[in-house]
């Protein structure tokens, strides 16, 4: 279920402040955030945002086709190690 259109998209205020601060400075650095729930706005394009996955910050370079999605969609939180296999090799 999506968010109501009358509410509009959501992004944490501290993340928007960090993006605006980057626009004023000439040097682009990686922006760290814990806000996986924030929607990617068009103003985020071209920035690298390090999104927390529960263990470490994973850098995500924001491109045009990512607009409208959430930051957490691009950083998986679980590591798939494969299904249990046959133990015939060990016997």
UniProtKB/Swiss-Prot annotation:
Functional note: Protein S19 forms a complex with S13 that binds strongly to the 16S ribosomal RNA.
PROSITE patterns linked: RIBOSOMAL_S19 (PS00323)
Superkingdom, natural source: Bacteria
Organismal lineage: Bacteria, Bacillati, Bacillota, Bacilli, Lactobacillales
HAMAP family: Ribosomal_uS19
Keywords, ordered alphabetically: Ribonucleoprotein, Ribosomal protein, RNA-binding, rRNA-binding
GO molecular function: rRNA binding; structural constituent of ribosome
InterPro entries: Ribosomal_uS19, Ribosomal_uS19_bac-type, Ribosomal_uS19_CS, Ribosomal_uS19_SF
Protein name: Small ribosomal subunit protein uS19
Biological source species: Levilactobacillus brevis (strain ATCC 367 / BCRC 12310 / CIP 105137 / JCM 1170 / LMG 11437 / NCIMB 947 / NCTC 947) (Lactobacillus brevis)
Family the UniProt entry places it in: Belongs to the universal ribosomal protein uS19 family.
NCBIfam families, alphabetized: rpsS_bact
BP-aspect Gene Ontology terms: ribosomal small subunit assembly; translation
GO terms for cellular component: cytoplasm; small ribosomal subunit
Gene3D superfamilies in UniProt: 30s Ribosomal Protein S19, Chain A (3.30.860.10)
SUPFAM superfamilies for the chain: Ribosomal protein S19
